[in-house]
């Protein structure tokens, strides 16, 4: 499997509970390496832009409110099959359906406060990385 990069986000519901280190450790323990990371407090415009794909969905307003409610950690992860590996470590979107030992099973509060986001494909990984990072901020 090829070395690839993916985008990862630790959401405000997790940062407010001081889970940044615990979640990052789970990612690193699975063989992913953090090659870029920063703490941001999303503006409404940034959240609406990042989640524009969901703008017509009924949960969009609640999503934007949640993402602007506190600090977020945005990261670029690197490793073999990083996109799929990150998705597996995160677990199902609904923590009730997530496998034991996944980030969402261990740390998520609900489907809306599910602690993390990760890219689902190479194209979205590239877009999401570019949304938050310049090339000079990614050091690996």
From Swiss-Prot:
GO molecular function, one term: nucleoside diphosphate kinase activity
Keywords of the record: ATP-binding, Cytoplasm, Kinase, Magnesium, Metal-binding, Nucleotide metabolism, Nucleotide-binding, Phosphoprotein, Transferase
Source organism, top-level taxon: Bacteria
Catalytic activity: a 2'-deoxyribonucleoside 5'-diphosphate + ATP = a 2'-deoxyribonucleoside 5'-triphosphate + ADP; a ribonucleoside 5'-diphosphate + ATP = a ribonucleoside 5'-triphosphate + ADP
Pfam families (UniProt xref): NDK (PF00334)
Keyword Phosphoprotein among record annotations: yes
Required co-factors: Mg(2+)
GO biological process: CTP biosynthetic process; GTP biosynthetic process; UTP biosynthetic process
EC number(s) reported in the record: 2.7.4.6
Binding site for ATP: 11, 59, 87, 93, 104, 114
Gene3D superfamilies linked to this entry: Nucleoside diphosphate kinase-like domain
Active-site positions on this chain: 117
Cellular location(s): Cytoplasm
Gene Ontology terms: cellular component: cytoplasm
Homology family: Belongs to the NDK family.
Binding partners and assembly: Homotetramer.
NCBIfam families: PRK00668.1 (NF001908)
Function recorded in the entry: Major role in the synthesis of nucleoside triphosphates other than ATP. The ATP gamma phosphate is transferred to the NDP beta phosphate via a ping-pong mechanism, using a phosphorylated active-site intermediate.
Protein name per the record: Nucleoside diphosphate kinase
Species in which this protein is naturally found: Rhizobium johnstonii (strain DSM 114642 / LMG 32736 / 3841)
């Amino acid at each position: 499997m090829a070395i690839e990069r993916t985008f990862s986000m630790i959401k405000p519901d997790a940062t407010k509970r001081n889970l940044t280190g615990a979640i990052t450790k789970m990612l690193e323990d699975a063989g992913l390496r953090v090659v870029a990371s920063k703490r941001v407090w999303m503006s409404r415009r940034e959240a609406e832009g990042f989640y524009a794909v969901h703008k017509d969905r009924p949960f969009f307003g609640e999503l934007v409110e949640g993402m602007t409610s506190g600090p977020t950690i945005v990261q670029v992860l690197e490793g073999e099959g990083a996109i799929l590996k990150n998705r597996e470590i995160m677990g199902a979107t609904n923590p009730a359906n997530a496998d034991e030992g996944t980030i969402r099973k261990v740390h998520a509060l609900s489907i809306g406060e599910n602690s993390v986001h990760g890219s689902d494909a190479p194209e979205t990984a590239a877009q999401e990385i570019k949304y938050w990072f310049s090339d000079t901020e990614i050091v690996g």
